[in-house]
Amino acid sequence: MSGTVLVVGSINVDLVVSLARLPEPGETVTGGEFARHGGGKGANQAVAAARAGARVRFVGAVGDDDLGATAVDALAGEGVETGAIARLDGTATGVALIAVDAEGRNQIAVASGANAMVDAAMVDAALAAEPLGPGDVVLLGFEVPDEAVVAGARAAATAGARAILNPAPARDLPDGAREGLLLTPNGLEAATLSGETEPAAAARALARRTGAPVLVTVGADGALLVDGGCIEIAAPEVEVVDTTGAGDALNGTLAAGLAAGRDLEAAARAAVEAASASVQRPGARG
């Protein structure tokens, strides 16, 4: 029987402008096309996990505004269970302003809004309603406060569940969320966390720190999995439209694979394939 993926993470609305090129500091670039998408790393990862076949529960928060209602409805429409998402009075839903160029590269600015209010009590309430089991996977990210991340990590450890931490945006690993977590940074985040600039060296350093495997994404080259040895997972060559959300597709698919009982390398390979597919479509969720 497959386990459940519990995502503790962010929910945003993405406001996207597609441009011929990205602006330099202080520069205005006109002629772009506008679109609005569901976003937030946690929400994107939850959607990816659900599309990969997992049962997905979500712990997070939105504001008491139309954007929040739309964001929650979009998650529910993807099959994500939204009962543990708090609607906070007097708070705005998180928003990301995204510029994407003709090569699919992006610049992103985020107003966290309700995401900054996600706390351990929300995690505890969700787990009181339905505790974790050994086959479950908890997927955590740094777009919500440390206390929520630590609560999710500790609950996973207590239940014997797998915990994945996508340390984005990169910051120091909090006490209580270091040992035993599967880290999934990109190359820049791995370098920031480890002090090592070369991805394989950074992955090994992080694995020594956590005592657990590390999966470092390296863009078009795929990913490096350190689990004892170092395994290179190549990404297929694809035509890139938009790289926004590629890491989220990887993390959600990875969590779904592990919840389904796949071994780590097989789940990681499927996750890289999903990330490669995601960059061929516009928007963080394709």
Predicted feature locations:
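Gly/Ala-rich phosphate-binding loop of Rossmann-like dinucleotide-binding domains
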Residues: 50, 157, 259
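Conserved phosphate-binding/catalytic region of the ribokinase-like
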Residues: 1-5, 172-176, 199-286
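Conserved phosphate-binding/catalytic loop of the ribokinase/pfkB sugar-kinase fold
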Residues: 87-88, 98-137
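Conserved beta-alpha-beta core of the PfkB/ribokinase-like small-molecule kinase fold
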Residues: 123, 135-204, 212, 221-222
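Short beta-strand scaffold segments in enzyme catalytic cores
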Residues: 47, 95-99, 107-108, 222-226
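A glycine-rich helix N-cap at a beta->alpha junction
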Residues: 74-90
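Glycine-rich phosphate/adenosyl-contacting loop at the front of the ribokinase-like
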Residues: 1-61, 66-77, 240
